[in-house]
Every structure is written in structure tokens, then in C-alpha cells.
């Protein structure tokens, strides 16, 4: 397939959600042949089929319309500002990786550099110049731009597809590729509403300056609202609308062939299956916010390589998770579960209900039927929440980053500042797949090509350390490791793994003592992949693994929540964890046993990258704040330094060894608690119906500097406000609520504490409500604070056995 563009080609792999910075050309095209930066045999990986190639093109480039979300809806509906220029300005291209963890697009250039078609920043409005911009820049402030996705050449429908044999797929134009911003995973589109005259006026007469647009504007004297910038000013339109492909979080450096200079990678140094271990997407999403706002503190504290996937569809659970690598998916375990979902069919009953069967108008036999069946599904996400099928999980990623937001899901989200339970936005409601399919063409454009995307994802393979070191085979690596860790260390480690680890971290069946964990499949269709996924993907109670439990308490897939339709009935039927104080019903309270394939390349460890050294971008990284605390929870005066990003083979291996040491010696870990670096105050003005007079409780919740970030991210402030009102108008109801939850003695005490707080606040308008320990226990979705505890399996091994296990795992 060929997507035509002016100069160059994009060539990468994929991860869990990824994309690339330029458009894609098939091997053998004239443009690829004339492009010196691209090996003509390299296109996302070697030997892809046409279907896999199309899947890669889509997954790398498609934004599916979310540029509109990130330009308008995100700011106006969620009240959170992104300063795209701060993140993407071309004059800071050399700092982009270290500061934001973004990977520079090899095909883009800084205006004014030798051989760059753009000679000045004013030509590109301060951004990099990228392939396709010669056309795109002509449409800034104008309509009529033809998206490069329109040139996508689909492969034929699979034989037997219920929607075949005629091709009735949604137009590929609705995939919306745009062009690269210069950072892989972020795409730009010309803004037809851009007003050049206004832009020059607000930015001092300079097209390449965004200073006036992003600078704080002093509020009117008669208002107490904090100063905000024109980022939220709908009357000023930027030159570009910025979109995000799923790969924004997952394209990164290939462990087998890392770049000599991470600021200047080549295409052959990049992979799409690894996950971006350096990306600071939480900080990017809050880049236009002041540090003392609740929004920034909710968004801005994830480690590099981790992101809270429910930050936008917020469930008030601070639950950052890593951007996973997708490896050997063909051997990932499947589970039979009870699934309600839409399935392809070619007809619906006459006069039927479109809520259970719907045919796309004008498309003969392109229908979908909603039914309940037993299906074999993967457990996807950290707690296995995405559990109705791989295709649906792939598509949900697009919605989670803004596709079909206005048509489909923004009105199902929580408004963090809406305190009236009778108003829209107070809580969540479920995303409706059938309704969004009907109303959003971008949904259909992605859905009609999910089979190709999945085929591409199935190409991901392990990154073997012996290959990364340029050795002949794994035996040569074992020889090296035995020299480093001791004679026979690898074989001894295999025995330790078989007896202590494989019951969770192997997809083969017990007994494990004689199993070969590197056995390659002999089935031709498997293309030489290993039979062992090195994880069983079963769900285990979080109290058993005892790692930070916040991610396991993620609630968006529960009944009545935004992603309800993406969770299986079997998931929601699982019992809660009786060992937890927090609510854990409805499918919450579990982690899955993950894969250990290529573990040497993916340190630090655990779902939040917290076990092992802290990593950072070095001196330009203004987002790093030490999380290390003493036994009393106070910041260490002299914490261990962070390890500067090092994607080299030896850099990864050193980080792996240090992380294994931390993993196997939990008593030696210095506790990590990410704290606020700025005081945060949440203003609350709930209305109180008090007899004939309606009053407002004028108060604020204060979170001082050093407050664990999890406290605010997990704090149910809306329920607190409701209880303050209930304490005034129906104290008996409030008492019954907490007696039922905690028992008579404790429940009555909690109700009395809440009543006293409400009385105090009414007596002293404008006073500060401190979130003390008694309130935190009642209103926290997760009480977990320490981020690097748990997973104590293996701490009783001898030092020799720990070294041996470290050596063996490096061979997998």
C-alpha cells in the first residue's frame, strides 16, 4: 500500500498504542527509494504482509478525530490546559527527549538548519518542518485540506467476513493522519479558524511566537479567579490543531538497536512494540496548568513511562500504569468469559430494536447485533479490565485519547468541580458503543480496519539480550552471564524460576522443573515465536501480591461507569478482596500476572515503574522531584540521585540489575511517596437548603506541600460535600450510612465528626477544612501511599540464588 507524500517515509514497529511521526510508504515506492534516511527494506519491521502493513499505517498515524478534542473539548469541558508550544517548539527540539520523554521524528527538521525546506520559524509557526508540511501550511487559516489518510489503500476483506464480499468500509479519510509535529506520536492539522491578524496582535507581531497566547492574563480586579492564559480563550485560535495517535505513548527506542544519540535517532533505532519508557505524558497533559491547581496535581505526578489512563475519564483513583510492550501476543493466554457485546452480522430482523441490532444506512448487509455469549478473551490492562476482546480493546484506546469525544463520551465523564448530584457531570455514565458507532464516522473508520491493526500487533517479538549484544546465540550470552554472576548461575536461576516464579510467570502448565522456557513454536503460522508468554495473565487479589493497590482499584469498567461496555460480566462478578479496607467489588482489587519476556529491557519494575532506581531526563528535566521518604514519611534530605535516561544496551542492563536487586530485597527499599511540590487548595461552594433559606457552605480543602499525590488523586471530595450537606438536613440518614459501613460505634463517630465539621464551616465561612486522617480513611478510594512496596516473593532466597535468578531472567 502506498500513502503519497512529498519527501519521506515512516518506518517503525508498534506497542500497546502507538504511531509514528510521518506518513508511511510501502517498500519499493519511489519516495522510499529516494529517501536516504530510510532503509528500503525497513517498514515498521521486515517481511510484513500487506494486511500487517495497513494495520501499522493506521496504528502509527491515525488520530481518528481527536485533534478537535485536544483543541477545544479538553480545555472547555475538562478545564485543563495543554501548552503544546511549550512541549513541541522547534527551538527546544534538542531538549524534547530529556524534558518530556518524547522521541524526535527523524524525518523532521528545525527551520533554518542546512537542507531544511523551511528557512525560518515563522514559516512553521515555531514548530518543526515535517514531510507533508509544504501542503499543510498552505491551509493554515483555510478550509479544504485533504488529509493524507485518504490515500490509504485497504487490503481486501477477509474471506467469510459477514460484512463482505463488497467493500463497504468507512472512508479512510476519517482516520485523520495529518502530519508529524516533530515528536513521534503527536500529529498536527491546519486550523481553518486561525486568524493571522489576531495572532500577530497577541504575540507581538511574530508568527513564530506563542508568548502572548500562553502568558498568564491578569484577572479583573473585581474577580478572585486565578490568572489564566489565552489557552482557554476561545476567541484566539492557534495555527494548528494537535492530535494524538495511540503510539504517542508507545513508540520508543529499539532495545536491539538503540541510537547512539537519543536526540537524533534514525528509523532503524525505533520500535513500536516497546512502549515509551521515558514519556512524560501526564505532565504534557497538564503542561498549561499552574502547579497549585487540582488539575495539575491529578495529572502531573506519574513517573516517566507511566500514565494514568483514567485521568481524563476520571474515577478519582490515582492509578498510573506503565505503557506496556506487546510481545508474542499470539501466545498470550485466553480465558472463557461471559461477554455482552456487539458482533458482526449481515441482517437484522424487520422492525427490530436498533439497541440490539443495527444496520448502517446505505450499506447492504453491514449490520451489528448485541448479544451475550461465552467468548475466549484476553485480560488487558493491569487488572484485566478490558475483557470483551482484543479488537474492542484496541479501539477503546482511541476513545481514551479523545476520538469521538463530542459524539460519544465527553458527557459521560465526571466534572471534578460539579458538586450537585442532580446535575450532569456529577458522576459517570456508560459509554454507549452502539450509539457512537451510529453517530461517529471516525469510530467506523477505525472499527472497519481493526483486523489489520491486530495483525500488525501480532508481529511483536522479544528483544533478546544476546542479539542486542551482537552475540551469535543465547549460549554465548549464557557464557557471559555465568562469568559475571558465577559458574552455572543461569542454570541455577532456571531452577529457581521453575520452583518459585513459573506458577505465575509462565503460560505453560505445571510441573515446570523440566520445562524449556525458550521453546520456539514449530507451527509455520507462528513465524518462529516462543510458545511461552512467560506470564499466565490470571487475576490475583492485590492483597496477595501486596504492591501499591491504587491501580487495582481502578473503577471505570464497573457497572454504571464510563467503560462498562468494555468489561466482561465475568470480570464484574468477581468477589471483592476481603483483606482491603477500600471498596473492591465489581471487578476491582486484582492484578494480572504479567509477562516477563525481555525483562532486561524494561526496568524499573511493577505497574508504576516504582521498584528500582528513579529515572529522569537529567538537567533539563524540570518535572523530577525525589519521592524518597524516611520511615515517618518525610522527604529524605539526601535522597539517591535519579538515573538519567539511557536507552543503550548496557544502560538498560545496569538499570535491570539494580531493579532486580530492589525487587528481591524489599526490606532494603527506601520508601517512595510522590508528594506535592506546591500547596493546593480546592474551593467548595455546595448549596445547602436550610429551611426557608438557601445558603452556601463556603470552604476549601487544603493540601500542603509534601502531601502525597495519591491523597488528592484518591480523595472523593464530592462525597464529602454531600455528607456535609446531609449532616445538616438529615443526620439520621448520614448515621445509618456509616453504621452500615463501619458498624455502630465507629459509624456513629464518623457521622458525628462530619456533622461537627459542617457546623464549624457554617459558623466560619471561608475557613479551611483540613483532610485529616479520619476523613482520608472515609473518603479515599485507595489508602495506599507507599509506591514501591509489595511483591516480596523471593526475599528469602540466598544471595547466590538471587544473582542466579537475575542472570536467568536476562536470557528470556
Could you tell me what each predicted segment is?
Residues 12-19:
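Hydrophobic helical h-region of N-terminal Sec-dependent signal peptides
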Residues 2, 7, 21-812:
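Periplasmic c-type cytochrome electron-transfer domains
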